[in-house]
């Protein structure tokens, strides 16, 4: 701890970030890492034995292709086969008509690259077109490196082998031999979330970060999609299982903030918590067995009173409704998403994005051809790889690519100087490469925030030490050239994406916040009664809120990187946005607490009280996008009916009023914390 205290704050934050990423718990991560690790070693063995060129490309296919579950790996493998056919076909067409004319070759390759980048952003199968774009631009370097058309044709044909045999290998490893099924990962993930919930129910623990809660909720939704596609039993009983996922998410996120020490430990409350934990354990056992859980628990009056006293009645009712749900309930038909985005041909940003990528590639091609420096051809690949829809995400990808390339270059340098002279055979080479590939595979299976570092590190290392050589190599020039090529491509891309049609998310962020607040207002309009339809609707919209707040949080992180904006305006926007996100999460949890006490309200009185909050929030959200929102002020009218209900509800709703009053005023020239007391609220 003393060593960390002596380090600069940015370094401490960076170390904390990597510690969080490297220690991430995710079902299927260990099998995916082992599949990737074994696949890399087999690629090296096969490529060295049969002298197959482009080892780095084969490794890249593995890193992009091996996914967290067998179904996803199969899907990506099919896409890779289609992409290989398209990309090799496009290369042969380019060579046939323009092999000896670089200008004509670029004129033909340019529209292909633009079309691929356009479709990458607008089509559901964007990964296919991304692969075609990579090979289309990488193939332009072959004629410059070789003077013989026959040799270029052979290299291009080798690309088919290089792309397809790792695809076959990852299918054998990840699908046939050692499959990791999505249904198994879902069962493990649900049980892990329930374990965390029980821990917070029985012990006083510090709450987990909200961002982690939201990411876990989104991970469950992604696994649900894979289970629907991969498991027939899950599809048959999908209505029950989707309700199970929503219920587990609600229990996990709600109990994360629960503190059992804040309530009196009467014997009735202690027994009720034990009974609730026992029911959750029964649910876990059924999930482990892959069975739909059915419960015969009926809450007695004393248990209901204890649940209300310790603020667990809504969780209890939600759990019991799941236990009493018919497993054979017919699922709601899912709408098939369109293959193209709705504004694909009306939004000019998509075509501008393609033009910017082409411009960056042409600048790099002109530079490396003009200086006759073939070793830095990775600059063109960099321009395509770091091309992202907006400035912030492009900068994030540039940092990841540069960081991975730097680590890979350092490892390649140390490997060439210290290890390579002592190697005599392929077995020794594999033993030395094993820890490097294992580290890269573990990083590559982390979250999207850092996974590309592992991929880039291994690919850069292979480019510098294993590319097209089938024996010991001591040439340090390769390491220098590959690293400089990546740096040049990153710099050119940064300049292009910053000054040529920059796509800033600064204007989109308030609209995103308004959408999240609008969804929160819909939650408030749902009747606060223990009715099946209302509860299910509430749970599903609540999951959407987790996704909305997480998307806003990630967008804030990207806007921070947009240095083309005025620093003061950017800082003000980020501070206001983070305040809205933080208060929105608090409002959601505070509104959850009102459900337990709102049962005593008359059904006719409920919409009026909830409507006050929903109307105020909708009015505030409508003004966020135009920077015309003031902090909402709500007056709670104390009618005889409201005075007759539990005083706990009034206190809870007054707390919601306080949270409303702390929402930032978007009309103020500078953000100041709200100090005005909300009407109807007490401190």
Q: Residue ranges of each PLM-predicted region?
A:
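Pore- and pathway-forming membrane helices of multi-pass small-molecule/ion transporters and channels
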Residues: 9-18, 33-74, 81-89, 106-173, ...
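C-terminal functional regions that serve as terminal interaction/effector modules
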Residues: 418-419, 423-430, 434-438, 446-474, ...
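Alpha-helical transmembrane segments of multi-pass membrane proteins
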Residues: 61-62, 354-366, 376-387, 402-414, ...
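A cross-kingdom feature marking solvent-exposed beta-strand/loop segments within repeated
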Residues: 74-78, 96-101, 147-150, 154, ...
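Membrane-entry segments of alpha-helical transmembrane domains in multi-pass membrane proteins
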Residues: 27-31, 46-51, 74-82, 97-104, ...
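Juxtamembrane/interface segments at transmembrane-helix termini
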Residues: 125-128, 175-188, 447-451, 477, ...
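Long, hydrophobic alpha-helical segments that serve as membrane-spanning/inserting helices
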Residues: 1-34, 41, 49, 151, ...
């Amino acid at each position: 701890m003393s060593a960390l205290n002596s380090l600069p704050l940015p370094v401490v934050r960076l170390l904390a970030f990597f510690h969080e990423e490297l220690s991430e718990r995710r079902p299927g991560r260990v099998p995916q890492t082992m599949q990737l690790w074994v696949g890399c070693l087999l690629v090296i063995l096969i490529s060295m034995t049969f002298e197959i060129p482009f080892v780095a490309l084969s490794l890249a296919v593995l890193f992009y292709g091996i996914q967290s579950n067998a179904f996803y790996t199969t899907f990506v493998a099919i896409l890779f086969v289609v992409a290989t056919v398209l990309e090799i076909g496009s290369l042969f067409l380019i060579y046939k008509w323009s092999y000896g004319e670089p200008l004509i070759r670029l004129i033909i390759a340019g529209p292909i690259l633009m079309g691929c980048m356009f479709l990458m952003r607008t089509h559901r199968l964007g990964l296919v077109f991304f692969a075609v774009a990579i090979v289309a631009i990488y193939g332009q370097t072959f004629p410059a490196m070789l003077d013989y058309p026959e040799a270029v044709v052979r290299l291009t044909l080798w690309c088919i082998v290089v792309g397809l045999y790792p695809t076959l290998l990852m299918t054998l490893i990840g699908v046939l031999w050692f499959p990791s099924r999505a249904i198994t990962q879902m069962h493990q993930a649900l049980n892990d979330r329930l374990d965390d919930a029980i821990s917070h129910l029985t012990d006083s623990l510090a709450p987990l970060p909200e961002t982690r809660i939201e990411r876990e909720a989104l991970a469950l939704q992604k696994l649900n999609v894979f289970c629907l596609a991969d498991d027939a039993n899950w599809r048959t009983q999908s209505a029950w299982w989707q309700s199970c996922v929503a219920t587990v998410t609600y229990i996990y996120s709600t109990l994360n903030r629960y503190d059992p020490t804040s309530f009196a430990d009467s014997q009735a409350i202690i027994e009720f918590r034990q009974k609730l934990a026992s029911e959750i354990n029964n649910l876990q056992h059924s999930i482990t067995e892959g069975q739909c859980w059915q419960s015969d628990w009926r809450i007695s009056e004393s248990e209901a009173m204890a649940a209300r006293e310790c603020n667990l009645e809504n969780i209890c009712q939600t759990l019991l409704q799941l236990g009493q749900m018919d497993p054979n309930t017919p699922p709601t038909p899912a709408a098939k998403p369109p293959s193209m985005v709705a504004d694909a041909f009306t939004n000019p940003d998509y075509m501008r994005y393609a033009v910017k990528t082409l411009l960056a590639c042409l600048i790099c091609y002109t530079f490396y051809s003009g200086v006759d420096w073939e070793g830095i051809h990775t600059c063109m690949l960099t321009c395509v790889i770091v091309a992202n829809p907006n400035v912030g995400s492009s900068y994030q990808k540039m940092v990841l690519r540069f960081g991975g390339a730097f680590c890979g270059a350092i490892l390649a340098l140390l490997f060439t100087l210290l290890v390579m002279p002592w190697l005599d055979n392929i077995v020794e080479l594999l033993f030395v490469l094993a820890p490097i590939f294992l580290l890269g595979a573990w990083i590559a299976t982390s979250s999207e925030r850092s996974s590309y570092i592992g991929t880039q590190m291994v690919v850069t290392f292979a480019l510098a030490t294993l590319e097209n050589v089938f024996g010991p190599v001591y040439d340090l020039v390769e390491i220098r050239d590959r690293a400089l090529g990546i740096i040049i491509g990153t710099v050119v891309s940064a300049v292009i994406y910053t000054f040529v049609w920059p796509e800033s998310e600064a204007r989109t962020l308030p609209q995103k916040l308004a959408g999240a607040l609008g969804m929160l207002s819909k939650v408030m309009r749902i009747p606060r009664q223990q009715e099946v339809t209302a509860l299910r609707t509430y749970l599903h919209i609540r999951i959407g809120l987790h996704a909305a707040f997480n998307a806003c949080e990630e967008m804030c992180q990207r806007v921070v990187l947009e240095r083309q904006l005025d620093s003061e305006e950017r800082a003000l926007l980020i501070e206001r946005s983070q305040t809205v996100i933080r208060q929105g999460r608090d409002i959601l949890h505070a509104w959850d607490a009102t459900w337990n006490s709102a049962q005593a309200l008359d059904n006719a009185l409920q919409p009026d009280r909830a409507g006050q909050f929903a109307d105020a929030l909708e009015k505030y959200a409508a003004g966020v996008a135009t920077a015309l929102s003031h902090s909402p002020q709500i007056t709670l009218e104390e009618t005889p009916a409201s005075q007759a209900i539990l005083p706990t509800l009034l206190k809870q709703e007054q707390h919601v009023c306080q949270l409303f009053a702390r929402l930032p005023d978007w009309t103020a020239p500078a953000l100041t914390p709200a100090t005005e007391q909300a009407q109807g609220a007490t401190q």
